[in-house]
Each structure stands twice: as structure tokens, then as C-alpha cells.
Amino acid sequence: MANFKLMDQNGNNAGEVTLNDNVFSVEPNEAVVFDAIIRQRAGKRQGTSKVKNRSAVRGGGKKPWRQKGTGRARQGSIRAPQWRGGGVVFGPTPRSYAYSMPRKQRRLAIKSVLSQKLLDQNLVVLDKLTMDAPKTRDFVAILNGLKLEGKVLVVSDDKNVQLSAKNLPKVKVVPVNGLNVEDAVNYDKLVLTQDDVKKIEEVLA
């Protein structure tokens, strides 16, 4: 167990929080993180591309000319793949690109990213993060008070916080159960609350 600096949302020191070594101090595994991101991106693919094979193309039921005696190559349908306007051979059909990954590897991936954020000093833990109303200006003031620069990923279940960050291109807010490997890697800073840390540790520790 390691003690980590705890801050309030105004950027002031609010004491310390204990981080579980099994979650925030594991040896980062880049290969597993890479596999997790590829899996996550594969699951987002639509997989709706489709072309027609010779049975799906309209027409072509009649043999274009008789089998023998014309001197031309034998043909059975004008919708065969060698014809212009014919069907496509082995073309794409609707499919799901999603695939599974062992639970231990999925958990190791997110733990690796969290540990790397801690190593790189890109992790910020707040005692709480709340807003009375969705105000982008107030949320920007919070980020400035915390001296956060670059792309910032904020973990919060507060609806006002989520709405306040919608217009900020370099800020993304996700609920604690929506924290994922790809977002954590793509954003420079990760902001968690004390309660979020406990919830994450309950699942991953």
C-alpha cells in the first residue's frame, strides 16, 4: 500500500489517500495493453459492409446462348463473376469483428495503464468532484486550479460534471464503470476521486 497526495477540486492539499499496490503498482505490460486496445477498437467496427454474390444479383436466370455450336466460350449466366454487372466472389458480408479476451488479461491491461499513469506522475486524485450546475466556465476553472494541461480524462458519475465538459475538445468525462484502456492511454492526465479509487480497487484488487 502506498500513500498518494490527495487534493480538493480547487487544487489545495487535502491529505493523503492509500493506493493498492495490486492495482496501481504492477509492472506495466505493454503487449497486453496493445491487445486490449486492438480488441476495443475491433468491437467498435460496424461490420455492415456487404456486396452481392451471383445468387443475389438480379437477373441472369437464362443461359445467354446455347452450350455448343456458336464458337464462343460456354456461359451459364450473365451474372457470373466474370461478367460486367455480375456477382462478386468472396466479397464482404455483414459480420461482427468483436472477440473476447481473458478476464485476467483485461484486468492486467487497465492495471498496467493505471500504474503507468502513477509512474509518469499523470494521476490526480481528488477528495470529491461535484458541481451545482452544468457550467463549462466553472469546470475550466477547476481544471486550471488543478494545473492540468494537455488532454485530460476525468472519471466522474456526476451529471453536471459530464455536461460541463461536453464543449471542451481536450477533456473527456467517463463514469467509473466506463473507464477503459484506450481512453486512459490516449489522454495525458487521469483524474479520479477518492470514491472512484475505492470502486476500482474493489473490482481489480
UniProtKB/Swiss-Prot annotation:
GO terms for cellular component: ribonucleoprotein complex; ribosome. Gene3D superfamilies: 3.40.1370.10. It comes from the Bacteria. Keywords: Ribonucleoprotein, Ribosomal protein, RNA-binding, rRNA-binding. Disulfide bonds: none annotated. Coiled coil: none annotated. GO terms for molecular function: rRNA binding; structural constituent of ribosome. GO terms for biological process: translation. Residues 44-77 are annotated as: Disordered. Residues 51-71 have a biased composition (Basic residues). One of the primary rRNA binding proteins, this protein initially binds near the 5'-end of the 23S rRNA. It is important during the early stages of 50S assembly. It makes multiple contacts with different domains of the 23S rRNA in the assembled 50S subunit and ribosome. Belongs to the universal ribosomal protein uL4 family. Part of the 50S ribosomal subunit. This is Large ribosomal subunit protein uL4. It comes from Lactobacillus delbrueckii subsp. bulgaricus (strain ATCC 11842 / DSM 20081 / BCRC 10696 / JCM 1002 / NBRC 13953 / NCIMB 11778 / NCTC 12712 / WDCM 00102 / Lb 14). The lineage of its organism: Bacteria, Bacillati, Bacillota, Bacilli, Lactobacillales.
